């Protein structure tokens, strides 16, 4: 049976130590192209939208439906690490940087940031990591939706600009379609040259 994310952790923290409490997650660590997008979300306990869940198990139309409700009821910050930063700093450091930028972009400073995964960025607030946090914690699940929808929209736009690559479909992930486009048309400025599949396509590995 699928695990349902709850607001229990946040509610306990709010009762014991107070808030604000932000959930932080990212989208786009694995793709061969495009940015990493991180989001930080502070949910209003009195106005939590229905339907929030782990973005990886929601259908695209479900994510698109819940996205505006999160944006309308929560405090949201977004951070984007571009391909240059990914190639320069490596994917992990670029992801942590994007997370820190997302928290900085919040209009209020959180007391606690709940981070999906097992590594936390350096922040000016308390942090706590939570493995599979997007499946357990509503604030992180909301951040996962915001990050995923934001990144997907960027990749759809990129697909219109570069129609031979199919970015609007695979979102930069290593699908057979993407592999064929790389081998046929070569890498673009949006491809991550620090990733081995791109290096192979460029004859650098």
Label the predicted regions.
Residues 1-205:
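RNase H-like, Mg2+-dependent phosphodiesterase core
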